[in-house]
A protein has these predicted regions:
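Short secondary-structure transition/capping segments
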Residues: 39, 74-88, 144, 151-164
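Aromatic-rich peripheral "rim/lid" segments of glycoside hydrolase catalytic domains that contact
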Residues: 122-184
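Acidic-and-aromatic substrate-binding clefts and catalytic sites of carbohydrate-active enzymes
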Residues: 39-45, 90, 118-127, 152-154
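Soluble or luminal CAZymes and related metallo-dependent hydrolases
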Residues: 10-17, 87-98, 125-129, 167, ...
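Active-site region of glycoside hydrolase catalytic domains
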Residues: 1-86, 97-117, 139-140
Length: 184
């Protein structure tokens, strides 16, 4: 899982063109923080190993990680998550260990540009998962952005939302509270 050399070369080229274009505009653009991404915004070893790091003090690497996938993203019947389930915690640990090894430990900032867990009528498991996930991210200084699709119960394919944009109400205030309290 992770792409091929052609896709790695393409994203590296686009990242370089992007950074060089913004920097070439002059003024304060040389100090502007810019986010580059990995192939598919992925976090596998193959993907992270093939990202060309741009020598620029204001570049941030943006990735996405819905992990463990069968709990967080897939529409499977996997609805429970527990800190005592080593395969589930290992999935999260592995992602953050790779991000630390490739970037954080080298002074390269990372942002988790997308993460979330699908609503499967499993709020207590989602909260346990979120607490563990955020603890790992915060320990490395990685800010996380919850992927709110704007869709909820009416669309089973993308039930990651925590805010109802029609009624302007929080669907899962407990998730919002944890997002805020863990990242202060």
């Amino acid at each position: 899982m992770g792409g091929n050399q052609e896709s790695f070369d393409c994203i590296n080229h686009l990242n370089n063109v992007f950074v060089n274009t913004i920097r070439g505009l002059g003024g304060n653009n040389r100090y502007r923080h810019l986010m580059i991404t990995t192939n598919g915004a992925g976090t596998s070893e193959a993907i992270l190993s093939n990202l060309d790091i741009i020598n620029d003090d204001y570049v941030i690497v943006s990735v996405h990680a819905y992990t463990p996938y069968d709990f967080a993203h897939d529409k499977t019947t996997i609805t429970s998550w527990s800190v005592n389930n080593l395969s589930q915690t290992k999935s999260i640990d592995d992602v953050f260990n790779r991000l630390n090894n490739h970037f954080i430990s080298k002074g390269i900032p990372v942002i988790m540009g997308e993460f979330a867990s699908r609503d499967k009528n499993n709020l207590s498991s989602r909260l346990a998962w979120l607490e563990y996930y955020l603890d790992k991210a915060v320990s490395l200084g990685i800010p996380c952005v919850w992927w709110d699709t704007g869709q909820f119960k009416s669309d089973e394919n993308m039930t990651f939302s925590i805010f109802n944009r029609n009624t302007l109400e929080w669907l899962f205030p407990e998730i919002v509270e944890m997002l805020v309290s863990k990242t202060k």
